[in-house]
């Protein structure tokens, strides 16, 4: 799976979780960019990521995610071993 494909899938998950059409996730997207972001929606997003990409997100990874690029980096490592 390429990074572009990961961004596309992540964007779909964000749109679903935050119920926002047209939301685009980039390397610089952060919680501050999404008014609907709460601790509960974040946990729902993590669950959706786990289901979509087929791995369990570790707490240390969750805590390191500050921007979309951080998420993609973790997903890329887990999915592609990179």
Q: What are the residue ranges of the model-derived segments?
A:
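Phosphopantetheine-dependent thiolation modules in NRPS/PKS and related acyl-activating systems
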Residues: 2-47, 51-82
């Amino acid at each position: 799976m390429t990074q572009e494909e990961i961004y596309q899938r992540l964007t779909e998950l964000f749109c679903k979780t935050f119920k926002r059409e047209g939301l685009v996730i980039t390397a610089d997207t952060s919680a501050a960019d999404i008014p609907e972001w709460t601790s509960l929606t974040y946990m729902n997003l993590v669950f959706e990521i786990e289901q979509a990409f087929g791995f369990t997100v570790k707490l240390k990874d969750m805590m390191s995610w500050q921007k979309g690029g951080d998420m993609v980096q973790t997903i890329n490592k887990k999915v592609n071993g990179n």
